[in-house]
Amino acid sequence: MRMKDLYAPTLKETPSDVETVSHEYLLRGGFIRKVAAGIYTYLPLGRRVLLKIENIVREEMNRIGAQEILMPILQPAELWKQSGRWDDYGPEMMKLKDRHERDFTLGPTHEEIVTDLVKNELRSYKQLPLTLYQIANKYRDEIRPRFGLLRAREFIMKDAYSFHASWESLDETYEEFKKAYSRIMERLGVRYMIIEAETGAIGGNASHEFVVPAKIGETNVLFCEKCGYQASDEKAEYRGEYTQEQEKEKTLEKVPTPGVKTIEEVSKFLGVSPSKIVKSLLYKGREGYVMVLIRGDLELNEAKLKAHLKDQSLRMATPEEILKDFGVPVGFIGPIGVDVKKVADHSVRGLKNFVVGGMEEDTHYVNANHPRDFKVDEWYDLRTMVEGDPCPVCGEPLKATKGIELGHIFKLGTKYSEAMKAYFMDENGEMKPFIMGCYGWGVSRTMAAVVEHFHDENGMIWPLSIAPYTVVVDILNMNDAEQKQVGEKIYQVLSEKGEEVVLDDREVSPGFKFKDADLIGFPIRINVGRSLKEGVVELKKRYSKELVKVNIKNGFGTLLETLEKMKREYDPKEAAR
C-alpha cells in the first residue's frame, strides 16, 4: 500500500471529547471516526486491525472444536420473555417495534436465539457436546457511552455457546475456553489476569473474566500476592469476622437532625463514628421494595445484592418514588416501623446502639438495636471489598488494581434450557435440559485495550500480531531520484516476500512522515534518506531510539536478514521497561 493512496486521515489536534489515550490515538491515527455517541466507523487501518483480532479469536475457537455460525441481530421479544430477561436485562437493552407493533430487540447477547436454535435440532445425548460461536455486532444502550471503543453502544463481539449432557462435560469445555482465551492474550502480547467474576444479567453459577490491567479500566480487581487469589470487587467475598459488640442496649430515642442527610453529616452532627450508623437503602425490583441495610462506613455491592435476591431488575428507588410511597425525603429512611422486606449485610449483625434514619424528615433514631426495634428478613455478604480487606482464601490484605475486561466465560447450567424447554434424551431415555456455557470476547474493545497497554507520548505501539502493517518504508526526499528508486525497490522486494508494507511516498517533510509513522504505530520503519549516498538505509523499531544501519550496496540480503531479526526480537513490552 502506498501512503499517498491509503485512506488514513491523521489529525494533528486532539478532539475535544476525547477521554482516553486509546480514543485519542485511534481518532488521530485515522483508525476510527465518530458517528454519534458510542457509534464509530472503522477506517481502513482500523478495519485491518479488527480483522487480525477476529482471525486470532477465530483460529483459537476453531482449535478447540467450536463451529462458526451467524445469528440475527434483530431478535423477537417472545424469546426473551421465555427466558425471563425481557424485563430483567435492564435499560441497556435496545427495544423497538416493527410496523405491526411487534416487539424486538437489537441483540446485546444471543443466549435466547441459540437455545431456541438447538432445542429444535439436537435430540440425543449422542449429539453432545456441541459448541457454536459467532463474531458479530452487538448493541447496548449505554447510559453514558465513553472511552471510545471501550464503552460503545455498537460493538463487535465473539460470543460462543456450549451444550452438554453432563456437568463434567461443561467443566471440560470451560477449561478449554480458559486455555483458548489465555492463548489469545499471549498472541496479543499483553499482560493479563484471570479473575473470578459475578455472572450478572447473563446468569449461571460460575464465571471468570480475562482482564488487561489499565488505569482507566472499569473492572476493579482485587488480588492476593501471597496465595494468588484474583477476583472482581463485584465477586470478592468478605470472610473476615465482625466484632460482636458487648455493650448493653440503651433506650431507643428519636432525635432532631435538621438538614442532616449524609453519613458524614450525621456522624459529625451526632458525634458518632460512621461505623455506628446503619445506612438504609431502598431498592425496587420484581417483588416491589426491598430495604438494604449496611454499616455506614461500607459501600453496598449491587451485584451481590442482585445475585443473592436473584433479581437483575433491582434498582435504587428514586427520591420521587420514596417521597410518594413513604412520605419521607431521602436521607431519613430507616428500618424501624417500615413494612418492607429487609436484607442486611453481616456488618450490621454485631452492632449495638447504632443510628438509623427516623422515617420522618429531619430526624434520626439513636440507640437502635435489632431484633428489638426491627426485624431483618435475610442476611448476606453485601459489602464491596476494597484494598486492605482480608483475602477470602488466606486472610492476607488484598491489593487492588483496575483492568479492561476482554473475555468473560460463564457456566450457565440449565437456566436457559429449563426456561425455554430445551431438552435432549439421555442414555436412559429420559428427557433432560441441556447444561450450557457461554463465552464472550470483546473484539472491538480489544483494539482499544491494546492501545491503552502499548503506547507512548508519540502514538500507538502495535504488537506484530495485530499491527495494520508491519513495515513502513519512508522515502525522506521525494525530489531525490536515487531515494525514490531505492525506496520503490525495497517496497517491491518486501511486497513480493509477503511482508505487509506501506511505502510513504507523500510529498511531505521527513518530520511529518516520522510523526505519522509513530502515531499510527508501524512496528518497524525503514528510512531511505541521506545515508543512501554511502549505500546505507536505516531500520528502527517503533519503541526504540536505536537506528540500525544496513549497507545495501551489494543487494538486499542483509536488509532482509536484519528485518527478520528485528521481527523476532520485537516486543512492545520493552517500551514500558
Curated annotation (Swiss-Prot):
Top EC class of this enzyme: ligase
Record's keyword annotation contains Oxidoreductase: no
Chief place where the protein resides: cytoplasm
UniProt catalytic activity: tRNA(Pro) + L-proline + ATP = L-prolyl-tRNA(Pro) + AMP + diphosphate
PROSITE patterns, sorted: AA_TRNA_LIGASE_II
One Pfam family it belongs to: HGTP_anticodon
Protein name as it appears in the record: Proline--tRNA ligase
UniProt organism field: Thermotoga petrophila (strain ATCC BAA-488 / DSM 13995 / JCM 10881 / RKU-1)
Gene name of this polypeptide: proS
